[in-house]
UniProtKB/Swiss-Prot annotation:
Organism: Hamster polyomavirus
Motif Nuclear localization signal mapped to chain: 336-344
MF (Gene Ontology): DNA binding; structural molecule activity
Region annotation (DNA-binding) ranges: 329-345
InterPro entries for this protein: Polyoma_coat_VP2
Alphabetical GO biological process terms: symbiont entry into host cell; viral penetration into host nucleus
Lipidation (N-myristoyl glycine): G2
Alphabetized UniProt keyword annotations: Capsid protein, DNA-binding, Host endoplasmic reticulum, Host membrane, Host nucleus, Late protein, Lipoprotein, Membrane, Myristate, Viral penetration into host nucleus, Virion, Virus entry into host cell
GO cellular component, as recorded: host cell; host cell endoplasmic reticulum membrane; host cell nucleus; membrane; viral capsid
Record has Aminoacyl-tRNA synthetase as a keyword: no
Protein name listed in UniProt: Minor capsid protein VP2
Keyword match Transmembrane helix: no
Amino acid sequence: MGSAISVIIEMISYLSEISSVTGISVEAILSGEAFAAIDAQVTSLITMEGFLGAETALSSIGLSEDMFIFMQAAPELTSTVMTEFVRESVQTAFIFQTVAGSAAFSLGSLHGYLAHEVPIVNRNMALIPRRPADYYDILFPGVQSFTHALDVIHGWGHSLFQSVGEYIWDTLRRETQGAVESAVRDLSLQTTHQFLDAIARMMENSRWVVTNLPREAYSRIYGGLQNYYAELPGINPAQRRQIERALEYSNRPSIEDANSRQVLEAELGRPDVQRRSQQQEDSSSWFESGANIMRYFAPGGAHQRVTPDWMLPLILGLYGDISPTWQTYIDEVEYGPKKKKRRFQ
């Protein structure tokens, strides 16, 4: 009997201490509602806030591990102690009532009570009226957010650190992503401009030749005439002698031609004349396939870039600036010719 009373006194003192620390009523602790609420809060802190363990989460709300264990065992411990207390009380009363002559009545009345040592009452039954989290906010709109703003002690430091950390992380991620995208875009533009600039400079410094297409056409025509005359039948001897006399008369040199021929034959023995004549023969046997376009440089040695007029639209187009004519052609290709507005008479 004395041990049960001492245990009850210690439980009452410990319950008072926990109630003063947490602000939870003693009835809620004994019924188990306090442990369920604290357990849910600790789980939320570990899951959502990122605490490393239960001890850290308990210390953040002002509880120790012993208090948490006591709150867990309080309902069962209370039931056990009270049962033991009742049993010892009944035994004591039984002794006194036996002495007084009422043992039979006490034994008969207490036997039915002691047959239900485990209580059949629902332990999850609410002992206090349940109020939702937004109860006062429903009655007085805005009061919950106002009181939360005034409560600068409970969770203020951790919330501030978390908010500042999230802001710094979001800013760093956003700036890093923007810097990477800008660097990739600038690199692609720079590479494209360098490639187009290299093509433009190569075209400016290249040697351009206009192919002589008429000469090739004439050679094909005269080749066909030559084949035509080659297939004609031969001439008779009288016609041949007549043609030879005509050619001999046309090729007869005059006095000036004879004098120049004598001078040339006299100089043929010199080495420089022989070399010059050999070069003339070589040059006459070789001919170009087209006409070379002369390249003009900047006047005065300014070493500036020079582009012919016929190449200027192409060079400007490589640098992104096109002529109005070219722009009109592109618009017609992409969007089609402009439709003329029909005039109504």
